[in-house]
């Protein structure tokens, strides 16, 4: 026990949240070919759908910090998981472009919040010696969440529609949310409000700006691969849709293996020394 919360339970909740982030990153790209076929979308309409995912993620990434500091981690983690699940259900049931766009913004918003929120939560409950390896282990669950969608769609799409498969995944996600609800989380760090002046002062940190610059391109490349790979395979090559999903799974598997490798490396090597080799 620690200050009224159980560290392992909180870490488990963070891992569930990271699984949801993995789902949010990969779902649209996995079902996009099926949506295009189902709704007979034009190229412009397809692009308009994909554009709304990073918009939601950017918004979520910007707002999570002040809210978590003021109201605590639980105030964001559980609602964000619900938002992602609701957006997923929107992809199943909505056939209107505006409603689909709202669903995709929701998936992105919840995912963007969960990405930062879960990392911050694990950082707060971890000691300095275990922080790097714990955050890397958390990242493995991003891979598990992201692997599940294209894998299940690729395997089961010959027997079930993508709507049925997503409904089954939604039930599992709902169980994860119900698990997180009764867990006690750490108290808010800034219960009196967010120090705006200190936050703006971070913009002067050159190392932070450099890492943000690197992450900008990395996340952009990852987003393009996640959202457009299956459509590209279907339109430009002769690769069947289910095999395109398997190809997408391979990329996510590579990310997951890298996260597992980080767990070992960060126990022996400083993260700053690993970064140049990753680039």
Identify the role of each PLM range.
Residues 1-5, 187-211:
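Juxtamembrane intracellular "pre-TM" segments in multi-pass secondary transporters
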Residues 26, 54-58, 62, 147, ...:
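Residue-level signature of mid-helix packing/kink "hotspots" within the transmembrane helices
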Residues 28-29, 206-249:
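Extracytoplasmic gate region of multi-pass secondary transporters
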Residues 40, 72, 93-98, 238:
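Helix-breaking motifs and short loop linkers at transmembrane-helix boundaries and internal kinks
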Residues 59-95:
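Conserved MFS/SLC helix-loop-helix module at the cytosolic interface between two early adjacent transmembrane helices
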Residues 87, 98-106:
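Paired small-residue
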Residues 99, 137-184:
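Helix-loop-helix hairpin linking two adjacent transmembrane segments in secondary transporters
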Residues 104-140:
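Cytoplasmic helix-loop-helix junction between adjacent transmembrane helices
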């Amino acid at each position: 026990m620690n200050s009224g919360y159980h560290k392992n339970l909180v870490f488990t909740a963070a891992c569930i949240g990271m699984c949801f982030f993995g789902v949010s990153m990969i779902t649209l790209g996995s079902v996009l070919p099926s949506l295009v076929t189902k709704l007979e979308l034009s190229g412009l309409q397809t692009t308009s759908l994909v554009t709304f995912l990073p918009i939601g993620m950017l918004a979520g990434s910007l707002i999570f910090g002040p809210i978590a500091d003021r109201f605590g981690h639980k105030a964001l983690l559980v609602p964000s998981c619900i938002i992602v699940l609701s957006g997923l259900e929107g992809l199943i049931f909505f056939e209107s472009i505006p409603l689909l766009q709202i669903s995709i913004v929701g998936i992105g918003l919840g995912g963007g919040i969960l990405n930062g929120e879960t990392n911050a939560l694990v950082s707060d409950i971890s000691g300095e010696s275990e922080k790097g390896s714990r955050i890397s282990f958390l990242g493995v669950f991003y891979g598990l969440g992201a692997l599940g969608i294209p894998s299940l769609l690729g395997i089961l799409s010959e027997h079930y529609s993508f709507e049925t498969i997503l409904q089954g995944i939604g039930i599992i996600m709902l169980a994860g949310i119900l698990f997180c609800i009764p867990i006690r989380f750490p108290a808010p760090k800034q219960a009196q409000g967010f120090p705006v002046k200190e936050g703006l002062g971070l913009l002067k940190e050159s190392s932070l700006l450099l890492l943000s610059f690197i992450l900008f391109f990395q996340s952009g490349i990852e987003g393009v691969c996640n959202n457009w790979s299956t459509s590209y395979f279907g339109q430009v090559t002769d690769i069947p849709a289910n095999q395109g999903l398997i190809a997408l799974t391979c990329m996510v598997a590579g990310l997951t293996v890298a996260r597992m490798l980080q767990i070992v490396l960060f126990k022996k090597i400083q993260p700053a020394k690993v970064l140049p080799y990753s680039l």
